[in-house]
Amino acid sequence: MNHIEQLHEGVSVRGLKKLTAAALGALALMSAAPAMADVIDFESIGSATYNGTEQFGEYGYTMQVIDSAASQTGLGFAGAVGNGEDPFLCAIAACPVGNSSYYYMGVNDGGLKISRDDHKTFSLQTLQYAFLPPVSGLPPDSYGMLTVLGKTATGGTAVANFRFPVLNSTGNSPFRTAGLAAAFGNIQFTNVTISSCLWDDGGACINPAGNQAQFALDNLTLTPVPEPETYAMMGLGLAAVGLMSRRRSNKPQANA
């Protein structure tokens, strides 16, 4: 190999090393940095009431209120967004404590279905929840569970249940944070439905429950699927590495 060939070979090798390092560095960053999470906190909604089938949205997600399965029309009062600082929020029911912000209330055995506006999939990481007793003054106990049911793009389902916190001495429920990693991992859902159930005398958790299965919900952390363009950019970088490698291997070898 003469001096000129050695020079070209050195430039090619250095270029390949730089491009490989850049592509692998980008891949490492993509692997280390998760997609940006969205937090639904209901702050932009304000105080509102909803009947079954009604919808509202926040931060690129659509929430559809679901009436009780016992409802004949599916259009009954089943949800509301309220301000925890409002002293008149709960005239009969016992509002949760420890939350001075806006939060969602599923009432009268109702539920809430969540999906993305762009119909893409997402994972659910955490949420805060509480029991919404239908009347005040209930003795301290856990009266049921929150149910989280996710539907995947292939039509499968995954479900997780979380016991309601024990009521305090005044009959109000504190909020509790539910981590969903153990139940769902990074499963991608097309939609998630959140509802509640109450224990019956036989120990089963039931819904419908005479319009008494009610819950409060706040600060849902959701992570959308990364945009396809992200993977495309990484693929282009790795393809360029492969191209340079092939060009180098196909180059005629000089005689010594």
Regions found by a protein language model. Give the residues of each.
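Extended, low-complexity, turn-rich repeat/linker tracts enriched in Gly/Pro/Ser/Thr and Asp/Glu
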Residues: A130-Y143
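Bacterial N-terminal signal peptides that target proteins for export
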Residues: I4-A22
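Extended extracellular/luminal ectodomain segments enriched in beta-structured repeat modules
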Residues: H119-T126
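N-terminal targeting leaders for non-cytosolic proteins
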Residues: D38-S115, H119
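Terminal, low-complexity interaction segments
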Residues: I40, S44-G46, N51, G60, ...
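C-terminal membrane-anchoring or membrane-association module
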Residues: L243-A256
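A short, hydrophobic C-terminal helix/tail in secreted or cell-surface proteins
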Residues: E227-R246
